[in-house]
Regions:
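Basic, polyanion-binding surface patches
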Residues: 1-167
Length: 167
């Protein structure tokens, strides 16, 4: 077992060490979508979390540097599409800037014209209720207005900087 890297009091941890440490926390992978100005847009996130059961709230954390989020934030509604193993190739491509994130996807339109994947493990239709600045990211909170789930696949996971599957 590797020893812990110590951080001197009053000093922030090195960015790479911080990412490596958080990379040890396995997460699911989601495709957050919206339709600002009627045009589909989406970004891959692994920072999705539930916030509240009553009312049902979720949050995700897009980067302040994301040009896609800069467009998406103009929309009132967004979708959360929980990805399965079958989506790994898509997730790799969609995580790159400038990618055509809707090519070869099967999707339908939800509230606010939000694109929703037809083969996602779960789909949440949400309305943005808050956005809070937090360092170099934002914390976006959405109220879940509708949802559906499916057991058609195993979840796609992200761990230590790589996509993974349950074993």
């Amino acid at each position: 077992m590797a020893l812990l890297a110590r951080v001197a009091p009053g000093r922030a941890p090195d960015g790479r060490a911080f990412r490596d440490a958080l990379g040890r926390f396995a997460t699911g992978v989601a495709f957050v979508t919206a339709a600002p100005d009627g045009e589909p847009a989406g970004l891959i996130v692994n920072s999705l979390t539930s916030v509240s059961l009553e009312p049902p709230l979720v949050a995700f954390c897009p980067s302040h540097h994301s040009l896609t989020w800069a467009r998406m934030r103009r929309a009132r509604h967004f979708g959360v599409n929980v990805l399965g193993r079958r989506h790994e190739r898509f997730a790799r491509c969609a995580a790159r800037a400038g990618a055509d994130r809707f090519a070869d996807l099967s999707w339908e339109t939800g509230r606010g014209s939000v694109p929703l994947l037809t083969d996602a493990l779960a789909v949440l239709e949400c309305e943005i209720v808050a956005e809070h600045p937090a360092g170099d990211h934002s914390i976006v909170v959405g109220r879940v207005e509708a949802l559906r789930t499916s057991d058609i696949d195993e979840p796609l996971l992200f761990y230590a900087g790589m996509f993974r599957a349950l074993q």
